[in-house]
Every structure is written in C-alpha cells, then in structure tokens.
Regions:
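Radical SAM [4Fe-4S] cluster-binding motif and immediate context
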Residues: 1-117, 122, 135
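C-terminal accessory regions of radical SAM enzymes
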Residues: 113, 128-197
Length: 197
C-alpha cells in the first residue's frame, strides 16, 4: 500500500510517468503482483513500468505477464546467467535451457521487451560453456544482454568452496570487490583472465 501511495503522489503531484521496480523478488509473490497491477489498472494512469535489475524466470507465467502489460509494463530484465545446463545446475538456478527459451518466448508474446543478464567465468565453467552462453543470448529474442564476470561473494557457498580449495584468499576478498562486475575478480583454472576480459 505504501508503494501505491508513493506512486499516486509522484504521478499526481510531480508528473512522473515511468517507474523502475528495482526488486529482484517482485514477481515471486503472484498474488501481490496481481493486486498491485489491478490497483494500477483501476487508477487508469497513463504510466510505464519496467524491472531493469532482473526478475526470476521461473516465477513468470502468461497470466501475470498479460496483467503486467495491461498495467503499463513494457520491459523486464531476467537473470539467465548461463547457456550451459551443468553450470546452471551448479549455480542452483532451478531453471533449465528449455524453460529459459519458453519464458523468454511468453514474455515477448505478452508484448514485453526482454533484457538478459549472464555470468561468465563461473568456477565450473569451460570455454565451451561460455560459447553456449553467448550462442543462447544471440538465439533468444532479447533487446540486449549484459555479460558480467563472476564475482565470488563472501558468505556464499561458492566463496567458501573457493577459499577451501585455495583458489582465493579470504583476507584478500576486499581487493576482489573494489572493482566493477566487468573486472575479473576470479578466473577458472582452465580459462585465462585475459580470455575472460
């Protein structure tokens, strides 16, 4: 309700007509999305929405996407991450390549643009996996794609695995993160840093 009140204020008093929903979990609660979209539709606002930072593909269905389009959505970013199923499985993404293709297709059928996020340099990844990722990005009906280098984040299982295997040093992790995701903070044994760059 607070978000709707803020949108009302910004729309009415400041003439704002476009809103970025920066919430990775926005589509996780379908009932909330339905309620939110219906509230916007009932207001009859001339308004546009997008999710530029990404939502989970496995939360999307045609009913939700159609309602979002009716409420003013024009664009979704989605975290696809890899075109390699073994890499997706190791990341515990709970998606498969077939699902990626299906979900991107229904997003487009609902009339929304799609932007994809991908990660390269994941610990189990090979050059062949990276080629599969690039090929998937080219194959999908995306308006754009962002390829970020893998960054092992402290507190994650993959960070701990890399520390335990001697691939990174825990005390040096701040050096890894004084950079952008375009920088290479870690490179798998079989892929030189220069190749990832």
């Amino acid at each position: 309700d607070n978000v709707l009140m803020e949108i009302d204020l910004l729309y009415r008093d400041y003439g704002i007509r476009e809103f970025y929903i920066v919430d990775d979990n926005f589509t996780a609660d379908k009932a909330m999305v339905k309620k939110f979209c219906n509230e916007i539709i009932n207001r009859k606002y001339d308004i546009a929405f997008c999710n530029p930072n990404g939502v989970r593909l496995d939360t999307l269905d045609m009913e939700m996407l159609t309602l979002m389009k009716k409420a003013g959505w024009y664009y979704l970013s989605v975290g696809i991450e890899s075109g390699s199923q073994p890499v997706l499985d190791h990341m515990k993404k709970r998606i498969n390549i077939t699902l990626v293709r299906e979900k991107v297709s229904i997003i487009r059928k609902a009339g929304l643009e799609v932007y994809g996020f991908f990660i390269v340099g994941y610990p189990t990844e090979t050059l062949e996996d990276i080629k599969k990722t690039v090929n998937l990005a080219l194959e999908l009906d995306l308006i754009g794609a962002n390829f970020s280098c893998f960054h092992p984040l402290p507190g994650t299982a993959i960070f701990e695995m890399l520390v335990q295997n001697g691939k990174i040093k825990r005390e040096k992790f701040t050096e890894l993160f004084n950079s952008t995701y375009a920088d290479v903070a870690y490179s798998p044994d079989n892929i030189p840093v220069k190749t990832l760059k």
